[in-house]
């Protein structure tokens, strides 16, 4: 306890000097060794015993994580490291590598300024490595590289000294190629990783040693000595001479930015307010005396303290009893406690200044992505965009009717804790639908509802979430209000792919300045008139008001858009979410008396015009795809390719390395249920595989009627396919 207390004192002493702080994330593909690396960094800081490091998985504090051997949630910890005679505070977040939990990585990247990208020396860069690197660069988070499992390269692949260096060099080149391809401007500004400079370290997290060029100069240990130690399997001596925590933490302190250096560039990317305003200037210098600007990146439940909101404090200081505004809430919230994380433990402190990662209780209105501030009316931070979308859904029911009210509350809570989860109540069937990133994601959530929340549930087998879109143009189509006093005339057409890409990458939103948005839309191919007339963006769909001088339209527009968003959430063909739909309001006739153009009149008229127009414009379904990467011995290759091709999959590429073949393929998500067991059988358990979200592609016409009818029956709709006339006012 004494050691822990001493650590807290050191942490709080360093908190108030942003120059001595490094906020970092550890990111990688699944099983490349992130959590083992984190544990050894903690052991080096004296926070867990060296004997248990790498085996304790301190950062995987959840029972499910220990059982499955994977990281599911991001874990935070603050620790102290001495570099060149000075103490530094490292706020570290260990993130998941499994594609189903990629949302945690995205959110963690908003909280940190630098990332240690971990790569397995044998496997090299894998799909999730690319995804997390792209996410880091998008959030202006600077990377350094740790090549792990170098001992495997030497002892399992039996490479010699020279070949080892060639292979490691190729790996570094590949990472730099990725960085350059994703953000050339940053690459040219010095964000490439370079072993000679010191932004790359090599080692073994499991055996607790690491080496880098600065470390070699410091210790006098050469590459050939490292090779010999590994050959002789004398990892203990290597760990004594070149302790992992020293090489990696030195690299973090020297090459990753402090909050002061980082926030100058980062604030512009994640906040669209006026940078010359008081709060804009305070955030760019991490001013602890300024107004509070705190972004929530994670919400978890504490059995004693309730909801804990964790996030990054960009300016001001947080302390107990403070009244703050939460974006989207009408009343202020009172902070009850502030603290820092030590793995599973949250330690209370009196106050936390700007530049730190803080854990706060009492923010009852907070949600992931919320802006918390002492400044009323502050422009909120840019919302957090996730790389993948929820593509698998299950229906959830309480086993016992008495638990139904509790289940409703629990589902609200888990959706708040994990924003990549979408919870909806199916009005027709009364079922609660839970949509997530994949089978494993939903399995883990269902297990937690039972284990942590104490509600017994039953779930249906997983189903795929499709997308509705249109391939043609239709309109103007008239929509009449039930009282016949209001009429709307709309045209629908496919939204330009370039505009969809801008929306998907979060490069345009209705919150950005109009002139900036208009310029971006025109550059993406819209004419000036359309670029000026966009009035709403919902998911990857857009609504344009092309009318001129219509009386009462302004005060009715909110209701018209409500009709639009209702259709985009549940399209006319099968009540699946819509994507890539462009709706243009060409004309409108409105009753002069506001009583006759209320929500019950305007919303149905707006909705039905769009529904009918979409069915006239060849409404169709797109299905989600995943890329599937398989590593398999050559003699098992046939079984693996057959398994993919038997699931409507296609082989994109095949490469061989030694006696191993790497297969890159893609297949529809609907065909990949049960793939884990089948690929094991097909390859005698010798295949290693991973997946990555690959977007949506048209559902083959041969399957369309069967799939649409199946979805409609499941949702309690008429099995017969709808016609435009069904939605047109008589």
Swiss-Prot record:
NCBIfam families, alphabetized: aEF-2, small_GTP
Positions bearing Diphthamide: 596
Residue ranges annotated for the tr-type G domain, each copy included: 19-229
Organism listed in the record: Methanococcoides burtonii (strain DSM 6242 / NBRC 107633 / OCM 468 / ACE-M)
Protein name per UniProt: Elongation factor 2
Disulfide links within the chain: none
A molecular-function term among this protein's GO annotations: GTPase activity
InterPro entries per record: EFG_II, EFG_III/V, EFG_V-like, EFTu-like_2, G_TR_CS, P-loop_NTPase, Ribosomal_Su5_D2-typ_SF, Ribsml_uS5_D2-typ_fold_subgr
Keywords: Cytoplasm, Elongation factor, GTP-binding, Nucleotide-binding, Protein biosynthesis
Localization of this protein: Cytoplasm
Keyword flag Cytoplasm: yes
Gene Ontology CC annotation, any one: ribonucleoprotein complex
Function, as annotated: Catalyzes the GTP-dependent ribosomal translocation step during translation elongation. During this step, the ribosome changes from the pre-translocational (PRE) to the post-translocational (POST) state as the newly formed A-site-bound peptidyl-tRNA and P-site-bound deacylated tRNA move to the P and E sites, respectively. Catalyzes the coordinated movement of the two tRNA molecules, the mRNA and conformational changes in the ribosome.
Signal peptide span: none
Positions that bind GTP: 28-35, 94-98, 148-151
Family assignment from sequence similarity: Belongs to the TRAFAC class translation factor GTPase superfamily. Classic translation factor GTPase family. EF-G/EF-2 subfamily.
Pfam families for this protein: EFG_C, EFG_III, EFG_IV, GTP_EFTU, GTP_EFTU_D2
């Amino acid at each position: 306890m004494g050691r822990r207390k001493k650590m807290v004192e050191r942490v709080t002493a360093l908190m108030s000097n942003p120059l001595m702080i490094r906020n970092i994330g550890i990111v990688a593909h699944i099983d490349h060794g992130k959590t083992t690396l984190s544990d050894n960094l903690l052991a080096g800081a004296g926070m867990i015993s060296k004997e248990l490091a790498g085996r304790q998985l301190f950062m995987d504090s959840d029972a499910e994580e220990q059982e499955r051997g994977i990281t599911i949630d991001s874990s935070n910890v603050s620790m102290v490291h001495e570099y060149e005679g000075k103490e530094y505070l490292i706020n570290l977040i260990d993130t998941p590598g499994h594609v189903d939990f990629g949302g945690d990585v995205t959110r963690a990247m908003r909280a940190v300024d630098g990332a240690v990208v971990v790569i397995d020396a044998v496997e090299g860069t894998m799909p999730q490595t690319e995804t997390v690197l792209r996410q880091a660069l998008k959030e202006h988070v600077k990377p350094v590289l740790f090549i792990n499992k170098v001992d495997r390269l030497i002892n399992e692949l039996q490479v010699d000294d020279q070949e080892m260096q060639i292979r490691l060099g190729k790996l570094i080149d590949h990472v730099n190629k990725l960085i350059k391809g994703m953000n050339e401007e940053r690459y040219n500004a010095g964000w490439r990783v370079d072993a000679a400079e010191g932004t790359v370290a090599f080692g073994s997290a499991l055996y607790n040693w690491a080496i880098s060029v600065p470390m070699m100069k410091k210790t006098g240990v050469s590459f050939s000595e490292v090779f010999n130690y590994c050959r002789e399997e004398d990892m203990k001596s290597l760990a004594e001479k070149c302790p992992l925590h020293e090489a990696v933490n030195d690299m973090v302190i020297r090459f990753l930015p402090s909050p002061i250096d980082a926030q100058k560039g980062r604030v512009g990317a994640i906040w669209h307010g006026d940078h010359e305003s008081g709060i804009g200037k305070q955030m760019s210098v991490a001013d602890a005396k300024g107004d509070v600007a705190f972004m929530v990146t994670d919400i978890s439940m504490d059995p004693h303290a309730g909801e804990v909101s964790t996030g990054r404090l960009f300016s001001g200081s947080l302390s107990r009893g403070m009244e703050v505004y939460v974006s989207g809430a009408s009343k202020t919230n009172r902070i009850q406690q502030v603290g820092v994380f030590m793995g599973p433990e949250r330690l209370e402190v009196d106050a936390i200044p700007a530049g730190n990662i803080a854990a706060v209780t009492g923010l009852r209105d907070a949600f992931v992505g919320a802006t918390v501030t002492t400044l009323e009316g502050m422009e909120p931070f840019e919302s957090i965009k996730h790389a993948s979308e929820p593509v698998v859904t299950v229906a959830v029911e309480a086993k016992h009717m008495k638990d139904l009210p509790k289940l409703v509350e629990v589902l609200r809570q888990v959706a708040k804790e994990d924003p990549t989860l979408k919870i909806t109540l199916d009005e027709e069937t009364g079922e609660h639908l839970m949509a997530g990133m994949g089978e494993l994601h939903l399995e883990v959530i269902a297990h937690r509802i039972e284990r942590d929340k104490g509600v017994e549930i039953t779930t249906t087998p997983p189903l795929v979430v499709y997308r509705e879109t249109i391939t043609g143009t239709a309109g103007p189509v008239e929509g009449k209000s039930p009282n016949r006093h209001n009429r709307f005339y709309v045209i629908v057409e496919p939204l330009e792919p370039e505009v969809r890409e801008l929306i998907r990458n979060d490069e345009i939103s209705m919150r950005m300045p109009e002139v900036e948005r208009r310029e971006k839309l025109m550059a993406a191919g819209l004419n000036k008139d359309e670029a000026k007339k966009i009035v709403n963006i919902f998911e990857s769909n857009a609504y344009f008001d092309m009318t001129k001088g219509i009386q009462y339209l302004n005060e009715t527009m909110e209701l018209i858009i409500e009709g639009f968003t209702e259709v985009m959430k549940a399209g006319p063909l099968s009540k699946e979410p819509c994507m890539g739909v462009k709706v243009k309001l060409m004309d409108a006739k409105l009753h002069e008396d506001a009583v006759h153009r209320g929500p019950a009149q305007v919303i149905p008229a707006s909705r039905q015009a769009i529904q009918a127009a979409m069915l006239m414009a060849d409404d169709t379904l797109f299905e989600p795809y995943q890329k599937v990467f398989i590593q398999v011995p050559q003699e098992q290759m046939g079984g693996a390719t057959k398994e993919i091709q038997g699931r409507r999959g296609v082989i994109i590429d095949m490469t061989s390395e030694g006696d191993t073949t790497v297969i890159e393929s893609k297949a529809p998500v609907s065909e990949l249920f049960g793939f884990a067991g089948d690929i094991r059988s097909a390859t005698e358990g010798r295949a290693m595989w991973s997946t990555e979200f690959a977007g949506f592609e048209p559902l083959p016409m041969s399957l369309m009627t069967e799939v649409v009818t199946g979805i409609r029956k499941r949702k309690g709709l008429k099995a017969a396919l709808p016609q435009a006339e069904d939605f047109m006012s008589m």
